[in-house]
Amino acid sequence: MRILIANDDGALAPGIAALHDALADMAECVVVAPIKDMSGVSGSLTLDRPLHPQLLSNGFIALDGTPTDCVHLGLNGLLDPVPDMVVSGINLGANLGDDVLYSGTVAAAIEGRFCKRPAFAFSLLSREPDNLPAAAHIARTLVEHHERLALPPRTVLSVNIPNLPLERIRGIRLCRLGHRARAKAPVKMVNPRGKEGYWISVAGDAEDGGPGTDFHAVMQGYVSITPLQLDRTFHEAFAGLDSWLEDLL
C-alpha cells in the first residue's frame, strides 16, 4: 500500500512528521505538503500560477500551494505509482463542528476522496505537540484497519483526538458535527506607519455541543470520528423551495 500524507500546517510541522513515522513501517508513505502554514484555506486550488514541488532534506515534498493542491498534484501526475489512499494531519488544533468548512486538513482528505481514494483527516485538540505520540498511535490503528470499513462512496472520516496521553483516552465515539457560535469580532490594529489592518479572531465556542456531537466526545476524553459526505445538498429544503419557486414563476 502507498499512502499520500498531506496537511495544512506545513511540510515542517511536527504533526505531519509524527504521522509519517507512525505509518512508515506499515506502508510506503509519501509526504506532499505546503511549504508554509496554510491553515484555514479550505479546499482552494491555485489557478493563477504554476506550482513548484521541492524535495526537502527529510525526504518530504514541499509545494508552494494549498493542501488541496498537494493532494490533487500528488494523485494526478506528481507521484508514480499513484498512492492508494490519503491521510491528512496531524493538525495541531481542533477541526470540530463548522471548522470542517474552513479546514485545509479536512479539505486535503476531501480532495483525496474526489480522486476516489479512501481518506482520513486527523486533528489533535492542542496547539502544542506534547500528545502527538498518542494521536499518531490512534491514526495508525485506524489506517491499519481501514479495509474493514464499509463506507458509502464519497465519504471522508474526520477524526479529532483529545489532548491527552494515550492511557487517559477513554475510547472512540462515532459523532455528528456540532456547531459553533458566531466567531469573535475581527481585531483592528494600526501598524507603526499608521496603516489600519484587521486580524481574523478566534472561532466561536460550541453552541451545539451536547451528547452525540464531536465537541462533547472530545471534551469527555473520547476520540471523535465523524463521517463527512461530499454531497452538500440539503434535501429536506426541496419541498419548501418548490412551492416558493412556483409562486415566483
Curated annotation (Swiss-Prot):
List its EC numbers: 3.1.3.5
Q: Where in the cell is it found?
A: Cytoplasm
GO cellular component: a single term: cytoplasm
Q: Which reaction does it catalyse?
A: a ribonucleoside 5'-phosphate + H2O = a ribonucleoside + phosphate
EC main group: hydrolase
Listed Gene3D superfamilies: Survival protein SurE-like phosphatase/nucleotidase
| Keywords, ordered alphabetically | Cytoplasm, Hydrolase, Metal-binding, Nucleotide-binding
- Enumerate the Pfam families for this protein: SurE
Cofactor(s) recorded in Swiss-Prot or TrEMBL: a divalent metal cation
The entry's a divalent metal cation-binding residues are D8, D9, S39, N91
Molecular function as annotated in GO = 3'-nucleotidase activity; 5'-nucleotidase activity; exopolyphosphatase activity; metal ion binding; nucleotide binding
Q: How is the cofactor bound?
A: Binds 1 divalent metal cation per subunit.
Stored NCBIfam families: PRK00346.1-3 (NF001489), PRK00346.1-4 (NF001490), surE (TIGR00087)
Q: Which HAMAP family match?
A: SurE
Quote the function comment for this protein: Nucleotidase that shows phosphatase activity on nucleoside 5'-monophosphates.
UniProt lists the family membership as follows: Belongs to the SurE nucleotidase family.
Protein known as = 5'-nucleotidase SurE
Q: Which gene encodes it?
A: surE
